Design a protein with these regions (language model features):
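Active-site hotspot residues in diverse enzymes, especially metal/ion-binding acidic/histidine motifs
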Residues: 1-204
Length: 204
């Protein structure tokens, strides 16, 4: 059978053997996901904003519950799941070397600002590695190219601009929805793969 997209929930639960739970992780929505490699407790919030306590067992991924109820946030939910799953993959592959510092041995938080920061300076290598692996798993070249063919985008997009190239932009937007990712995340990945030359998503 043909595969057209990666489903992070299936990947985490069926392939990696992880448990996924959806809860409110912060008052202001600033924390999108968290996981740990060992047993420890974390603060979460009930629907009425009362503080609660959740016990992480080292094999659980917590995701902000708001991401699970808004279809417009599907791309962000999928990336959050795969980001936290990537931390667990690295720990499985390198159990004696990954997540052993005092900082990384605790809870790994994925924050809402993580995918929008403009800085090119990498300040946390484990977070950068998790982002990079998550993008590679969610958006492999073969699936992007298959999707580009299905949506009539050719072999490469020269310019992504909503105002000047609306037809291309609409097909691209449909592709990102089809692949279950945000338009920005797909643009970053396509640039890495040489499938997109310029994008004006921030300033059309």
């Amino acid at each position: 059978s043909q595969v057209y997209r990666i489903e992070p929930e299936l990947m985490l639960e069926k392939v990696l053997g992880l448990t996924i739970e959806y809860m409110h992780l912060s008052y202001d929505g600033s924390i999108l996901g968290m996981t740990s490699f060992g047993e420890l407790g974390v603060q979460v919030f009930e629907n009425n904003d009362d503080e609660a306590f959740f016990f992480l067992d080292g094999k659980t991924v917590l995701v902000e519950s708001d991401l699970n109820y808004d279809n417009n946030l599907k791309g962000r939910k999928n990336f959050t799941l795969m980001h936290e799953g990537s931390h667990q993959i690295f720990k499985m592959l390198f159990p004696n070397d990954y997540g052993i510092t005092e900082k990384s041995a605790g809870v790994h938080y994925y924050k809402a600002t993580a995918d929008t920061e403009k800085s090119r300076i990498i300040t946390d290598w484990e977070e950068w590695q998790a982002n990079t692996l998550a993008a590679a798993i969610l958006l492999p070249r073969c699936l992007i190219e298959k999707g580009m063919f299905l949506f009539g985008l050719g072999d490469k997009i020269e310019c992504l601009n909503k105002i000047y190239y609306p037809a291309v932009y609409e097909r691209y937007a449909a592709l990102s929805d089809f692949l279950g990712c945000s338009k920005k995340a797909l643009a970053i990945r396509m640039k890495q793969l040489g499938l997109l030359h310029k994008d004006y998503l921030d300033n059309p």
